[in-house]
Amino acid sequence: MTINLLGALATAFIICAVTGPSFISVLHKLNFGQSIRECGPKEHMKKSGTPTMGGIMMLLAILVAVAVWCNFTPALCIALLLTFGHALIGFIDDYIKVVMKRNLGLTAAQKFFLQFVLAGAYVYYIETHVQSDLSIAIPGTEYMLPLGWLYYVLVFLLLVGTTNAVNLTDGLDGLAASVTLPVTVAYAFIAYNTGHADLSVFALAITGACLGFLLFNHHPAKVFMGDTGSLAIGGGVAALALLTHTELLLVILGGIYVMEATSVIMQVTYFRLTGGRRIFRMTPIHHHFELGGWKETKIVKRFFAASCLLCIAGVLLWLNGNGGF
């Protein structure tokens, strides 16, 4: 099985590395360039026109890697559905913004509806394929907290929250992909040690795709993943949390995602309550550090290191609640 895990990692990486230059060239010819908001950091204006929708090559790499190195089990199929389903939402959003030149893309209501449909697909899966008591594990303990029908609400909140948090994290060159690396490695470990070798292969396929994509997305980025990529990654990570029954642990493993999303919520809430005052210079919080004088590369390195530490802590906590090795 070790060969399958390493094979998936290597295959996804190689596909991204090999197809990247040609794919970026095609995006250039199609004029699929990213438009930069004027309200963002001024340094980002020079990135205008950089090809976006690079998430498509990541998805191709993930699909091929999984198809070559793993059988399509029900759990793997639902993970792919949540990943590619959210990728489709992101692609539609990117297409509207980049091709149709409508900067707002899909409305929030349209996104929520499509995500609700995907959440419904997962609910159908657990009702038909899993004998679940609709409970969640408390990290670091063996206690399972029964939620009943509230578990279905959690599914929707986790999917919407994770996908949008990853989307918010994708605001600097290489940031979302870098932060995701330790998260998917951690989930590969957890999945493998809970008897979900298929999900472990899937997690490492995402890892390989992110590594390959970083060859072209590191600063200065030659391509952006777009909503196509960020929503797909969010869907994949959320699927891993749901299918390994580590919903609450994701708050720790994906702590950077949580921090990014929370900073936006805090900023908007405080702004409205105080009539225009702000807590941070700009959100998501990576822009706060950027406007404070930190270079993009410094922020990405610090956030990556923090993500690694959070994932180590999360895995140790998970081991404590599961009797160790």
Write out the residue ranges for each language-model feature.
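Juxtamembrane helix-capping/reentrant segments at transmembrane boundaries
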Residues: 36-50, 101-114, 286, 291
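Hydrophobic alpha-helical hairpins/lids featuring a short glycine-rich hinge
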Residues: 72-107, 111-112
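Peri-membrane helix termini and adjoining interfacial loops of integral membrane proteins
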Residues: 31-36, 90-93, 129-136, 279-283
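Short aromatic-rich membrane-water interface segments that cap or initiate transmembrane helices
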Residues: 48, 138-150
